[in-house]
């Protein structure tokens, strides 16, 4: 028969309390800043996207991978970029699309602008398929500020374009 004496268990060794970090603790009460930063490195395009996507409805968007980029923006993946944020709707019925680019070289700006113009025109010419989508693409905005470019197809494209352009007037 099994022994009725309780099994001996080894107590875990006491560990030292964690050492105090020399780094300041994050301030949990501070609101995170979603304003794009303008600084030594210029405009942070991901911060700009985060800011507008919290203001405007960009539901069901996914990151644009190289395969999608090559299909919808031929030539864009060959451009050397300092920053790239590409978002595309997961469903074809939505015309929401956003491309934010900082070209590494000013020599590429005209080529990128032409690629963005071609995408817009392709969608307007029927690529967007649905009348509402085509209409939205007709009012899509393309902005160029130095090495920074944006294409936005959205119901609030003009407002988003104004916010993008305002980043460069500060």
Positions of PLM-derived features:
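Mature, Sec-exported extracytoplasmic domains of Gram-positive
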Residues: 1-170
């Amino acid at each position: 028969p099994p022994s009725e004496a309780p099994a001996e268990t080894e107590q875990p060794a006491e560990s030292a309390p964690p050492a105090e970090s020399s780094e300041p603790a994050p301030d949990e009460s501070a609101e995170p800043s979603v304003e794009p930063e303008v600084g030594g490195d210029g405009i942070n395009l991901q911060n700009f996207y985060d800011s507008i996507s919290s203001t405007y409805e960009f539901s069901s968007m996914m990151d644009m991978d190289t395969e999608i980029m090559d299909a919808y923006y031929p030539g864009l993946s060959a451009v050397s970029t300092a920053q790239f944020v590409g978002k595309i709707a997961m469903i074809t019925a939505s015309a929401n699309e956003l491309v934010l680019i900082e070209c590494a070289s000013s020599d590429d700006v005209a080529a990128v602008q032409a690629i963005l113009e071609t995408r817009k025109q392709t969608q307007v010419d029927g690529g967007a398929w649905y009348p509402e989508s085509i209409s939205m693409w007709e009012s899509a905005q393309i902005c160029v500020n130095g090495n920074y470019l944006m294409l936005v197809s959205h119901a609030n494209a003009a407002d988003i374009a104004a916010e993008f352009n305002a980043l460069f007037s500060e």
